[in-house]
Amino acid sequence: MATQIEPTTQEPRSRTGRSLTATRPLMGWRTVDILTIAFLGAALGVAFWGWGVFYNGPITALKIGYAPLMGLFSGPWFLAGVVGGLVVRRPGAALFCEVVAALVSMLPGTEWGATVLISGVLQGLGAELVFAIFGYKAFGLAVASLAGAMLIGPVGWWWAGQ
């Protein structure tokens, strides 16, 4: 009689052995989730504002030197959606964090004005789309990288139309 082998369904694990998938339903928001995203978004918003002040010097030099490298300096603005979605693994966390960061960076004043808020909404929606595709259950490096790449699409499309 042949021995039957049962298929195993092992979930992905990090190097430390922790699960990279959600272990319980993630639909409900707790107060700590809202506060975490609010503070994280505010901190990233201050960082975004600071980056905006620093941004013009290198960009001006790159416009003269080698313009295709200008995109490398846009990376920090794409952090909030991915980080928010990874830290608070709830539907809407990436969008919430990105919008809070955009609001905070807009309030002291930027050269881009209220368009920062539109950009933040588009970036948050891009990250949310990727997390939703994976059912808010996978949060590893591949999903985070894909979410970061997806942020660029809607924002690039919108800025190109400006």
What is the meaning of each model-derived region?
Residues 34-39, 75, 79, 91-99, ...:
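Hydrophobic alpha-helical transmembrane segments
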Residues 1-28:
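Short, Lys/Arg-rich, polar N-terminal cytosolic tail immediately upstream
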Residues 20-33, 84-89, 128-142:
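Cytoplasmic membrane-interface segments at the C-terminal ends of transmembrane helices
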Residues 41-49, 99-109, 149-159:
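Aromatic-anchored segments of alpha-helical transmembrane domains
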Residues 18, 118-161:
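Short helix-perturbing small/polar motifs within transmembrane alpha-helices
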Residues 61, 65, 101-128, 159-160:
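Interfacial aromatic-anchored transmembrane helix boundaries in multi-pass membrane proteins
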Residues 51-55, 59, 88, 92, ...:
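Membrane-interfacial segments
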Residues 22-84:
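Hydrophobic transmembrane alpha-helices
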